[in-house]
């Protein structure tokens, strides 16, 4: 398969999934979110996710600028125990649909803090993020997450820009180990884009993950 054909297939696949995901997302957005109301509800979130959604601990994700569709979906998964995390499960259980909508709307309006990419790794990360690897059937990350990591809000693809490299690497490893979307008993659960990310992550080496994590951290 030529490079052009490979890119076309990757983009076509992303487009088909985006249409399906967008339809699902629209059905889930029946409750309108208020960023102003969300600002009054994120007090407990600050301890881990930082002021204005910019985490200071690289183990915990920054949420500033994350698209609301994605935050809603993840909070619902935590609430339903379809994504296992002791801290998040406890917090999400108490949230109503309105709370989730408001919190998601708030974080979507916040500005990501600028982080720097590790100069030792970001070049290789850029090549994989933007061009993929045809020989290993790894599509470019930008096909779904955009050239500067803004994601695709309508399709539910998350923004990646300025995310901590440590967190990104950890999530890629979870996908590769079939551990990203599991319940407390370790049973695999469904998610909108989980299967695609699991398939791709299994093709990544630890070096690939490190390079991608560094490049993504430096995206603006």
Which residues does each PLM region occupy?
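Bacterial N-terminal signal peptides that target proteins for export
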Residues: 1-12
């Amino acid at each position: 398969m030529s490079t052009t054909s490979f890119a076309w297939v990757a983009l076509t696949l992303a487009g088909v999934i985006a249409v399906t995901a967008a339809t699902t997302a629209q059905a889930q957005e029946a409750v309108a979110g208020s960023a102003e109301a969300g600002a009054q509800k994120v007090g407990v979130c600050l301890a881990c996710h930082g002021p204005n959604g910019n985490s200071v601990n690289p183990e915990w994700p920054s949420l500033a600028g994350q698209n609301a569709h994605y935050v809603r979906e993840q909070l619902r998964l935590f609430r339903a125990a379809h994504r296992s995390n002791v801290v998040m499960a406890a917090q999400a259980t108490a949230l109503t649909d309105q709370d989730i909508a408001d919190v998601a709307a708030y974080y979507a309006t916040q500005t990501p803090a600028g982080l720097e990419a590790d100069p030792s790794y970001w070049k290789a990360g850029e090549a994989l993020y933007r061009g993929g690897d045809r020989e290993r059937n790894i599509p470019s990350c930008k096909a779904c997450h955009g050239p500067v990591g803004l994601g695709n809000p309508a399709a539910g693809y998350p923004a990646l820009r300025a995310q901590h490299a440590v967190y990104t690497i950890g999530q890629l490893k979870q996908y590769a180990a079939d551990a990203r979307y599991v319940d407390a008993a370790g049973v695999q659960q469904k998610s909108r884009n989980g299967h695609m990310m699991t398939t791709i992550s299994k093709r990544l080496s630890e070096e690939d993950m490190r390079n991608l994590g560094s490049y993504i951290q430096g995206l603006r």
